Curated annotation (Swiss-Prot):
Entry protein name: CTP synthase
Sites where the protein binds Mg(2+): D72, E140
Role summary: Catalyzes the ATP-dependent amination of UTP to CTP with either L-glutamine or ammonia as the source of nitrogen. Regulates intracellular CTP levels through interactions with the four ribonucleotide triphosphates.
Family stated for the protein in its record: Belongs to the CTP synthase family.
GO cellular component: cytosol
Residues reported in the UniProt entry to bind CTP: S14, D147, I148, E149, K187, T188, K189, P190, T191, Q192, K223
Organism this protein belongs to: Pasteurella multocida (strain Pm70)
Catalytic activity: UTP + L-glutamine + ATP + H2O = CTP + L-glutamate + ADP + phosphate + 2 H(+); L-glutamine + H2O = L-glutamate + NH4(+); UTP + NH4(+) + ATP = CTP + ADP + phosphate + 2 H(+)
């Protein structure tokens, strides 16, 4: 079957939840037996978000094949079973970079390179490539209609709709319908103006998703339909909800999936949302609560840890617990002391870069180890736990990472200069390598040691998890740290890189070099997070 395309745009203001709405629609269509994929087109000029500040952009989501992508791809993977790849996210910077590379190579035979047709053709070709092999491809355009940055993407999608045929394409526009308390009613004018903006560039939306803090009344929906040239049944109300996992059922209750299947002439069964109903039941009926202290350096923007936040919630679902996250700035641990860590049932130190606040993270690992508080370290969270153990248990008092101190006496963590990728190829890096796109990225195999907590949790000898780092445990000094009692319980496929460590004689102290949050989903959870949250609950009984 030829691929059908749903193009998702946003209007009026940003941050309305295009990604969540698109992923929720994808979940319904997948529940109808369709093979669905999703793409995100980002208008910024960065080649990828890998070097962007987490406090500006939010987290960088890493795909199975090692692409550093927008956090919306994390939403996509949490809502549907399809795994995202480097083909599912591209930016203006990546498009221009490829077009310029082709021009230098002579592919355009001396033509004058222009936005139309060369940039738009490259966009179309990447959309078609990313959608190949699926029944439905949902393509989200970042930004807001009217932004100058998104114009080439919108023009490319307009052309693609003409070339593929309108019977196989659908434009879905998400817009704001604000409630004005002084007037006591919702206002449709912003939506009308947003659609007018879209029409001015040649795109007539087929479906309107109306974001509001309440359900849009029938009269206003009819008004929007009339003035925006959209069937009334295609004006969908999307109100604020307490959980994003309620949205698939909310969209289905208004017949959005039926409208789309009829539009594409798809003969498929009704959506079976029983798995999502189970998720909502678990979420609404917890048997207890745990408080997790997340100690990081980007805590002013929780979206910087989006996948970690969601993975903790998923672990709560698996344990029938409500998980409350207490965000703690690691610099506060340095300046105010470990008192700021009191009152939590478990401590999680997520990934990060740079030396700001790192001593606070090391103090946090020490506090968790000495006070027998469940600890989960991820990426840098493993490295600081290793440094802390080396300093305070193994007696290597000046132990550090060369990322933070190049002249320390005991560089127990250092730059990885060589590693084996998932395909078995050897990759190399040096201090002179570029900052962007030079980390150990994507899924890598890990061998778990017999008798370890990690082996017990995963129930397997070999696992595969995603990485994003350029520093690792220094094997030269590793014997001294292990001799002091620290257990290395996970190693890379070639046995050269430390992937998991555990502290013995502790209720639950596990730290990993990889990012388990990227593979956690609301339906399946993740064994490390589930084990950590259970240990946090058990800690309350002490």
């Amino acid at each position: 079957m030829a691929t059908n395309y749903i193009f998702v745009t946003g209007g009026v203001v940003s941050s309305l939840g295009k990604g969540i709405a698109a992923a929720s629609l994808a979940a319904i269509l997948e529940a109808r037996g369709l093979k669905v994929t999703m793409l995100k087109l980002d208008p910024y000029i960065n080649v990828d978000p890998g070097t962007m500040s987490p406090t500006q952009h939010g987290e960088v989501f890493v795909t199975q094949d090692g692409a550093e992508t927008d956090l919306d791809l994390g939403h996509y993977e949490r809502f549907i079973r399809t795994k995202m790849t480097k083909r599912n996210n591209f930016t203006t910077g990546k498009i221009y970079s490829e077009v310029l590379r082709k021009e230098r190579r002579g592919d355009y035979l001396g033509a004058t390179i222009q936005v139309i047709p060369h940039i738009t053709n490259e966009i179309k070709s990447r959309v078609i490539d990313g959608a190949a092999g699926h029944d439905v491809a949902i393509v989200e355009v970042g930004g807001t209609v009217g932004d100058i940055e998104s114009l080439p993407f919108l023009e490319a999608l307009r052309q693609l709709a003409v070339q593929v045929g309108r019977e196989r394409t659908l434009f879905m526009h998400l817009t704001l319908v604000p409630y004005i308390p002084t007037a006591g009613e919702v206002k449709t004018k912003p939506t009308q103006h947003s659609v007018k903006e879209l029409l001015s560039i040649g795109i007539q939306p087929d479906v309107l998703i109306c974001r509001s803090d309440r359900m849009v009344p029938p009269n206003e929906r009819a008004k929007i339909a009339l003035f925006c040239n959209v069937p009334e049944r295609a004006v969908i109300s999307l109100k604020d909800v307490s959980s994003i996992y309620q949205i698939p059922a909310l969209l289905k209750s208004q017949g959005l999936d039926d409208f789309i299947c009829q539009r594409f002439h798809l003969d498929c069964p009704e959506a079976d949302l029983s798995e999502w109903e189970q998720v909502l039941y678990q979420e609404a009926n917890p048997t207890g609560e745990v408080v997790i202290g997340m100690v990081g350096k980007y805590t002013e923007l929780p979206d910087a840890y989006k996948s970690v936040n969601e993975a903790l919630k998923h672990a709560g679902l698996k344990n029938r617990l409500s998980v409350q996250i207490k965000y703690i700035d690691s610099q506060d641990v340095e300046t105010k002391g470990t008192e700021v860590l009191e009152g939590v049932d478990g401590i999680l130190v997520p990934g990060g870069f740079g030396n700001r606040g790192v001593e606070g993270k090391i103090l946090t690992a020490k506090y968790a180890r000495e006070n027998h508080i469940p600890y989960l370290g991820i990426c840098l969270g493993m490295q600081v736990a290793y440094i802390e153990y080396a300093r305070n248990v193994a007696g290597l008092t000046d132990a550090n990472s060369t990322e933070f101190d190049r002249t320390c006496d005991y560089p127990v963590v250092g730059l990885i200069t060589e590693w084996q990728d998932a395909e078995g190829n050897i990759e190399t890096r040096t201090d002179a390598s570029d900052l962007g796109g030079t980390m150990r990225l994507g899924a890598q195999q890990c061998h778990l040691m017999e008798g370890s907590k990690a082996r017990e949790l995963y129930g397997a000898e070999t696992i595969e998890e995603r990485h994003r780092h350029r520093y690792e445990v220094n094997n030269v000094l590793r014997p001294q740290v292990e001799k002091a009692g620290l257990k290395v319980t996970g190693l890379s496929a070639d046995k050269k890189l430390v992937e998991i460590i555990e502290v013995p004689n502790h209720p639950w102290f596990v730290a990993c070099q990889f990012h388990p949050e990227f593979t956690s989903t609301p339906r399946d959870g993740h064994p490390l997070f589930a084990g950590f949250v259970k240990a946090a609950k058990d800690n309350q009984k002490k």
